[in-house]
């Protein structure tokens, strides 16, 4: 497996590590998303312990408003984080 493929599989594995805990095994409920963000992105996203911030992120990701974040919806967060990280690298 290439380095990029390994990283892509890692993103999938992290999603599943949190999605299987409660509710549907392949979606994140708000509590699971909060745990994922708090533990996996503490240095990337600001105010991750603030419930209002989590609520806003969840609402923005939950495109179909079913109170769950699918992997497809989660990838929007990953994309935003990657774009921000890329932009920050070019600022240095």
Swiss-Prot record:
Found essentially in granulocytes with small amounts found in lymphocytes. The gene is S100A12. It is a peripheral membrane protein. Residues 13-48, 49-84 form the EF-hand domain. Zn(2+) binds at residues 16, 26, 86, 90. Cu cation binds at residues 16, 26, 86, 90. It comes from Sus scrofa (Pig). This is Protein S100-A12. Coiled coil: none annotated. One of its GO terms (cellular component) is cytoskeleton. In the absence of zinc binds one calcium ion per molecule, in the presence of zinc binds two calcium ions per molecule. Ca(2+) 1 binds at residues 19, 24, 27, 32. Residues 38-53 are annotated as: Hinge domain. Homodimer. Homooligomer (tetramer or hexamer) in the presence of calcium, zinc and copper ions. Interacts with AGER and both calcium and zinc are essential for the interaction. Interacts with CACYBP in a calcium-dependent manner. One of its GO terms (molecular function) is zinc ion binding. Ca(2+) 2 binds at residues 62, 64, 66, 68, 73. It holds the Pfam family S_100. InterPro entries: EF-hand-dom_pair, EF_hand_dom, S100/CaBP7/8-like_CS, S100_Ca-bd_sub. S100A12 is a calcium-, zinc- and copper-binding protein which plays a prominent role in the regulation of inflammatory processes and immune response. Its pro-inflammatory activity involves recruitment of leukocytes, promotion of cytokine and chemokine production, and regulation of leukocyte adhesion and migration. Acts as an alarmin or a danger associated molecular pattern (DAMP) molecule and stimulates innate immune cells via binding to receptor for advanced glycation endproducts (AGER).
């Amino acid at each position: 497996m290439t380095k990029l493929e390994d990283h892509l599989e890692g993103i999938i594995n992290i999603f599943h590590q949190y999605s299987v805990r409660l509710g549907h095994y392949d979606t994140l409920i708000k509590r699971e998303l909060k745990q994922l963000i708090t533990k996996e992105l503490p240095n990337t996203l600001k105010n991750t312990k603030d419930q209002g911030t989590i609520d806003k992120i969840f609402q923005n990701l939950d495109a179909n408003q079913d109170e769950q974040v699918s992997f497809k919806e989660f990838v929007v967060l990953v994309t935003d984080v990657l774009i921000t990280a890329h932009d920050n690298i070019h600022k240095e």
